Structure formats: structure tokens, C-alpha cells
Amino acid sequence: MDIKSIFNTIDKLNSRYVDVWEDVCNIESPSNFKEGVDAVSAYFIAIAESKGWKIERFPEDRFGDVVCITMNPDSDKAPVALSGHMDTVHPIGLFGTPATHREGDRIHGPGAMDCKGGVVAGFLAMHALDECGYTDRPVKMLLQSNEEIGSGINNKSPIKRICEEAKNAVAFLNLEGHEEYFKGKACVERKGIAGFLFRISGVSTHASYCAREGASAITEAAHKIIELEKVKEEGGVTFNCGVIKGGSVRNTVPGECEFQLDVRFSSQSDLERAKKIIQQVADTVYVPGCSCELTMTNLRPAMEKCERNLALLAIANAAFEKNGLTTLEAGMRTGGSDAADVTEYGIPCIDSLGVGGERAHSKEEFGVISSLSESAKRLVSIITAV
């Protein structure tokens, strides 16, 4: 294929897809708001219908539907899979009305960088390939619906569907965005994420009797949190206690308290070690009369460094160099993503190929407009090289 012609087509289509980017960010789609997530997928489905691509929708009861859009579905070769998530973090209305605005080279709004901008770059790449007559392989766009809540322990259906649809792919290109510090890198390794809920029961009594009776669930929680927060290994396991709830009034010894623990880990062995520490802290009674119930609330595996992902990056870098793009170093990210599940499935995968930006998961989130075309050009370079 004439890569120069494809790049020129990307440049020609770019402004149209910047508008698409703004449109989909204005459709607010928190993970638990199925109507909003489905509205985002409906927008992308309309683009696919206009191009005559194959569309498959996989219904979900609690979350947005998973959608698979395929260009060149009749090719007998193994597909290339692109994937990004449509859901965002914050409740509707936090960003104002409209939710999105442009400022210089930035689009501000929910999901601008994480991850709607990357999905738009994927559609831009597919549109340009289609317009330039690319028919070699199927190209699948897999739209995930609940990534931001961890594709969790009790809600794995969407990511399982993504992995099943991509299981024969020669490459899985995940479209998460990247900050300035990660520019020039491709993610081939990510930490895993586990969540735990500690529910502590104490003995409630009048505050004036606390010297001789009662057992404060909040005090027990405080001891446990201090012990857990000691675990902060730069390259390994980290513990963060992010939410605590306990007590009801000032003048009562609290009989109930609960807190949530976020765990990041680099490998399965790290996770097993972390679980032993957590269980030991849960079982230890610091305040006589208290007890603790421990529950794992979510689990996302680590994306461990592996040869097939490094081999795919080598192919990508050869294509980048050939096509006048800068090569990317192998990098590790401490945040989780669906690329971990995909890697565990045995599919060659590179992550963080979406748009540039900053401040993901905050009211100040933005994507860098000029990064859209570069992301699309990297994607078509890989697609035409594998």
C-alpha cells in the first residue's frame, strides 16, 4: 500500500474527526450509566453504517453493550484488533453544559484523553485505510463498556467478549491515551489492580464510658490502615486506602467502620504476596472486641512483559522508521487497562497508542488535538505491516 497516500488521507479527514471527538465527549457516559454508554456506541455505529462495515452488538444488562465493528469482514486472513472503552469516570453534569470545549490545541472534557480520543483515532485510521482501498486483513474495532470500573471481578462479561472477538488477531492495539511523560513510549507492561473491602465490627457504647467499655471500630480501622500504608514499593506492590466510612455521631463509640484498599502489583507472584499481607492485617486484632470481614471487590491482572508483545513492538518500530515516524521505547505504566486481560489471553498487544493528553480522571482532563493524526498514522503503519 502507498503509505503516503494513506497519511495524506488522514490529514484530509482529520478536522472531521476532531469534530467527532468533541461530539462523543459531549455524550456523557459514566460506567454505570448504560444509556449514555450506549449512546456513544450508537454514534460510532452510525459512522460504521455509513462506511458499510460489519456491525455486531453484544447486549449487556447492567453496562453499555459491547460493540464489534469490522472492516474487510470477508478477508480470510487473521484480523488486526483495535480497542478502546466508551465509559468515563465522573457523574453527569460535573463538567457543565456542554461538557466539552476546545481551547487552543486542547479538547477538554470527560474521556477526552481516556479513552474517547483514542477510539476516534482508531476510526480515523480505519476510514483512511478504507478510502485508500486497504483490503488485506479484517480490521476490528472493539468498543468496551465498563473499563473504568476495572472490568471487575463480578462484571467480566464485557472484557471476556472483547478477548473472544480478538482471540485470533495478529495484533491487538489498545487505544488508551498517554501523558507527556510517556510520550515516545509504547506500553508493553502494566501493573494489575485488586480492590479489597474491610468491614470492621466493634462494640458501641456511650462516649463517656470509652475508658472502661466499648471497642471502637474506627480505631481498629486506623491501626489496620497505618499498617497497610507501609507497603509502597516503587516497582512492585503498593497499597492505598482511599475510602473510609464509620460512626454516626460524635458522642458514641463507633461499632461499625469500613474502608477500601487499592492494591497495585507487577506480577501474579506479587499479588499472592500482597494477599498474604492483607489477610494477616485483617486477622490481627488491634482493639480487643473488634472483628473484621475481608472481601476482594475487583481484580484486574497485571500486563506482564512477554516476548510476543515485544516482538509486536519491534514490527511496529520497523514500520514507524520506514514511514518517517519516531520509534517508541518499551514502557511500563502503573495504571491498569484491558490490555492486561488481552495479554493474559495470549494475544500480541501494545497499549497506550491513543491520543496525548493530561489530567485523566479529573475535571481538568484534556486531549491534545494535534496528536490525533499522529495516533492514526501509527495505527495504519502497524496495520499495514503485520
Where do the protein language model's features map onto the residues?
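Acidic/His- and Gly-rich active-site-bordering loop/insert found
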Residues: 2-110, 131-134, 320
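Acidic/histidine-rich catalytic neighborhood of metal-dependent amide-processing enzymes
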Residues: 115-189
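Flexible, glycine/proline-enriched loop segments at strand-loop-helix junctions
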Residues: 109-113, 144-150, 207-215
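Phosphate-handling active-site elements
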Residues: 103-105, 125-140, 228-237, 386
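Glycine/serine-rich anion-binding loops at beta->alpha junctions
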Residues: 90, 106-121, 206
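Short beta-strand segments
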Residues: 83-84, 142-144, 172-176, 199-201, ...
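Metal-dependent amide/peptide-bond hydrolase catalytic core
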Residues: 1-5, 12, 29, 47, ...
